[in-house]
């Protein structure tokens, strides 16, 4: 698949972009290069290849899931302009 300069110009128009001639030519070349790479990837033979979940066959050592911060909601709410019953009160934006 490749795009013509006319098609790139139409895409730029729809995206509300204005491209000069140099930008149009560069963007056309860049997008066509990307499409060429995508076509190469699509043509790779992958039959018989197992999907992998992770590129390494090693496992990461995980740390224990322990709470390391203290409850500070009372401190945070003490500096808030308005609170009620543990909730922050903010001005109405949409009615």
Swiss-Prot record:
Matching InterPro entries: Asp/Glu-ADT_sf_sub_c, GatC
SUPFAM superfamilies: Glu-tRNAGln amidotransferase C subunit (SSF141000)
Residues annotated as signal peptide: none
Keywords, in A-Z order: ATP-binding, Ligase, Nucleotide-binding, Protein biosynthesis
EC number: 6.3.5.-
Single GO molecular function: glutaminyl-tRNA synthase (glutamine-hydrolyzing) activity
Keyword Disulfide bond applies: no
GO biological process entries: glutaminyl-tRNAGln biosynthesis via transamidation; regulation of translational fidelity; translation
Catalyses which reaction(s): L-glutamyl-tRNA(Gln) + L-glutamine + ATP + H2O = L-glutaminyl-tRNA(Gln) + L-glutamate + ADP + phosphate + H(+); L-aspartyl-tRNA(Asn) + L-glutamine + ATP + H2O = L-asparaginyl-tRNA(Asn) + L-glutamate + ADP + phosphate + 2 H(+)
Pfam families per UniProt: GatC
Assembly description: Heterotrimer of A, B and C subunits.
Role, per record: Allows the formation of correctly charged Asn-tRNA(Asn) or Gln-tRNA(Gln) through the transamidation of misacylated Asp-tRNA(Asn) or Glu-tRNA(Gln) in organisms which lack either or both of asparaginyl-tRNA or glutaminyl-tRNA synthetases. The reaction takes place in the presence of glutamine and ATP through an activated phospho-Asp-tRNA(Asn) or phospho-Glu-tRNA(Gln).
Family, per entry: Belongs to the GatC family.
PANTHER family: GLUTAMYL-TRNA(GLN) AMIDOTRANSFERASE SUBUNIT C, MITOCHONDRIAL (PTHR15004:SF0)
NCBIfam families, alphabetized: gatC
Protein name per Swiss-Prot or TrEMBL: Aspartyl/glutamyl-tRNA(Asn/Gln) amidotransferase subunit C
Organism the protein comes from: Ruthia magnifica subsp. Calyptogena magnifica
Protein encoded by which gene: gatC
């Amino acid at each position: 698949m490749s795009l013509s300069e006319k098609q790139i110009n139409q895409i730029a128009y729809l995206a509300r972009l204005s491209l000069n001639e140099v930008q149009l030519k560069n963007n056309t070349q860049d997008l066509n290069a990307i499409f060429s790479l995508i076509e190469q990837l699509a043509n790779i033979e992958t039959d018989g290849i197992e999907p992998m979940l992770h590129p390494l066959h090693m496992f990461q050592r995980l740390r224990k899931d322990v709470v390391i911060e203290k409850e500070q909601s009372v401190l945070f709410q003490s500096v808030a302009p308005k609170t009620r019953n543990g909730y922050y009160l903010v001005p109405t934006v949409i009615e």
